A protein has these predicted regions:
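Feature captures the catalytic ectodomains and active-site-proximal regions of enzymes
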Residues: 1-513
Length: 513
């Protein structure tokens, strides 16, 4: 008889780094995790690069991690897919891109591109912008403008100026394009309905409102001098002869080159929704609006360049087909990850799948100001679910190591790690009490490296470090094999539950007897 419930606990952004310097995982007091790693089956798992369908050496991220876990197989990511299409030349024949181009040609209007300008590879990749510039050049367009969203989370906090300078050099080399506006992702890429931020971004893009600068790099440097790094650069427009270089207006084409949906939805809604109540928008602009991927199927008036490749028989579907009950628990910041992404990009819950959302704190601008976030509330719900006897499977995410790690504030990251450790302790007690089994892992690293070891600058991005795989309260004869990746976790749980792995899942169980 298999144990019940089976809990998958995801410690978001909790990587393992042999260098203890500026490493919150190492520096925090973590008696629970230390004990589990020494007394339970424990190995390091891969959560980056080819092991999760990303280019070699590319750090993992939450979307990719949860997608690979839930699918029980390596899912080739949009980044890899789009880069490959540029290399193969298919990119230049994508019908939606050609529709945008034709609209500009026919009406003599401008082609605008916007998105994150960095090589972070989480939401976008700068080489994809170069592909779009090449596309514009091949099609003879001359009114081509890029609106740059600066990163500083998946890249160093003041690397944006360099990325924009590189972009401008590429524009010269290819022979087309100008930078029209610049803003931090804090404004343009909110995902928490903080519409006041999105409004500032939208008004810069469509009305030329905001700060002014004579050049993009000059404006970014001014922002740095003012103590605002990439993520927080207040929207500014680049002026030409005393006027904004370009604003998005009726008749133009827009290509939004972010491929990750969660932080692309709000600004897209501001442009595309016929009825929009996020802020007071004058009117819906008449545009050809192309998204790299489908950010949300409920957003209307948009074209999608790279359609979703469907993933069949995810863990959620598999459990539903076998009449098993399941619950997903997370706070707001990671709720989409344990639901939408874990289910292979499907919003609709499976039969027998409950969802518990604990609101993330709204009263702080950045989570270093509240590193415990809503972890205790999430943990309360977890313990309740474990003891309820209602569920065969519980999937839980603790957001703190990732969300606080992104701030680069070391004391706060340590507090985040310690908060989560205490929560893990409560879960372990509950699991032992009901004689269930728990698999603890992370989706990628982050909190275990908070400075760039070469430059000494704050390091706020994810890492390529391995993550913990820990098996708690399983049959004592089980060990875990080395060399596993995120795609192997669900096959492991399926074996623990005494069930047969579906053929669609190509991951391999980590259990060794």
């Amino acid at each position: 008889m298999s144990k019940k419930p089976t809990v998958l606990m995801i410690l978001d952004g909790y990587g393992l780094n042999s260098n203890c310097d500026h490493n919150a995982v190492c520096e925090g007091r973590t008696p629970v995790m230390d004990q589990l790693m020494s007394q339970c089956p424990f190995v390091k798992g891969e959560a980056s690069g080819m092991a999760v369908g990303l280019p070699e050496g590319q750090m993992g991220n939450s979307e990719v991690g949860h997608l690979n876990m839930g699918a029980g197989r390596i899912v080739y990511q949009e980044l890899t897919r789009i880069t490959k299409s540029i290399q193969d030349g298919d990119f230049f024949q994508v019908p939606e891109f050609l529709t945008a181009v034709e609209n500009c040609k026919k009406n003599g209007t401008a082609l605008h591109m916007f998105g994150l300008v960095s090589d972070g590879g989480v939401h976008s990749h700068n080489t994809h912008i170069y592909g779009l510039l090449e596309l514009a050049k091949r099609n003879g367009l001359d009114k081509v403008y890029v609106h740059c969203f600066l990163d500083g989370r998946d890249t160093p906090p003041e690397s944006g100026k360099g990325f924009v300078a590189e972009l401008e050099a590429k524009m010269k080399e290819i022979g087309v394009g100008e930078v029209a506006s610049v803003m931090g992702r804090y404004y343009a890429m909110d995902r928490d309905k903080r519409w006041d931020r999105v409004e500032l971004a939208y008004n810069a893009l469509t009305k030329g409102q905001g700060n002014q600068a004579q050049s993009a790099t000059e404006g970014i440097q001014d922002s740095y001098d003012d103590g605002k790094a990439d993520e927080f650069v207040v929207p500014f427009v680049v002026e030409k002869e005393g006027k904004p270089t370009a604003v998005i207006q009726d008749g133009d084409s827009v290509i939004f080159y972010n491929f990750r949906p969660d932080r692309a939805r709000e600004i897209t809604r501001a442009f595309c929704d016929t009825v929009f109540d996020g802020f007071a928008r004058d009117k819906k602009l008449d545009l050809v609006f192309v998204c790299f991927t489908d950010y949300d199927e409920t957003i209307e008036n948009k074209l999608v360049a790279f359609k979703k490749e469907s993933i069949t028989n995810t863990f959620g579907e598999f459990l539903a087909a076998h009449d098993k009950t399941q619950v997903r628990i997370a706070e707001t910041e990671k709720y989409a990850h344990v639901t939408f992404f874990f289910n292979g990009g499907v919003e609709e819950p499976n039969k027998g799948e409950d969802r518990i959302l604990v609101p993330s704190p709204k009263e702080v601008a950045t989570y270093d100001l509240k590193p415990e976030m809503s972890a205790v509330g999430v943990c309360d719900k977890l313990v309740e679910a474990i003891k309820s006897g209602k569920y065969d499977v519980i999937i839980i995410n603790f957001a703190n190591p990732d969300m606080v790690g992104h701030t680069g504030v070391e004391d706060a990251a340590i507090k985040a790690i310690e908060t989560v450790d205490a929560c893990v302790g409560r879960a372990v007690e509950a699991i032992k009490e009901v004689d269930g089994v728990m698999f603890i892992c992370a989706d990628h690293g982050n909190a275990e490296q908070l400075v760039d070891y070469e430059t000494g600058e704050p390091f706020t991005a994810h890492t390529t470090n391995p993550v913990p795989f820990i098996l708690v309260n399983a049959d004592p004869s089980y060990k875990l094999r080395e060399g596993g990746a995120l795609c192997d976790i669900i096959p492991t749980l399926i074996e623990l539950m005494g069930m047969e792995q579906p053929k669609e899942m190509t991951g391999k169980s980590l259990l060794v007897k």
